[in-house]
């Protein structure tokens, strides 16, 4: 199993886990095609949080272009019968879903009500 993380506080959790920290696009580009069974991801929301990691795009279009780069890699590395779960802020979720539907067969939208 490979787990890509941005949080440096997460540590190696066992002998079957390859924990990698870094830019997820660079790490995914190095992964073989059709090699992943499940992708569960919580990308930045786009200007919801006050932190720099969530405010690195000037426009929604720039954020969505970056998000589409992620989706391109997910499509490449995910096995044909693999699953993808991604979180999105409600304010931009509709646009994110349009991008996802261009590349994947969306079976269900799950709403997490906190």
Predicted regions and their residues:
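Core catalytic lobe of class I
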Residues: 2-114
């Amino acid at each position: 199993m490979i787990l890509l993380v941005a949080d440096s506080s997460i540590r190696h959790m066992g002998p079957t886990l390859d924990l990698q920290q870094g830019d997820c696009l660079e790490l995914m580009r190095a992964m073989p095609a059709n090699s992943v069974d499940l992708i569960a991801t919580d990308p930045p929301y786009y200007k919801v949080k006050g932190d720099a990691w969530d405010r690195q795009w000037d426009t929604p279009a720039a954020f969505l272009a970056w998000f589409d780069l992620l989706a391109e890699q997910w499509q490449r590395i995910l096995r044909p019968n693999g699953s993808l779960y991604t979180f999105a802020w409600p304010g931009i979720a509709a646009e994110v879903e349009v991008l996802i539907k261009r590349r994947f067969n969306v079976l269900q939208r799950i709403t997490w009500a906190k």
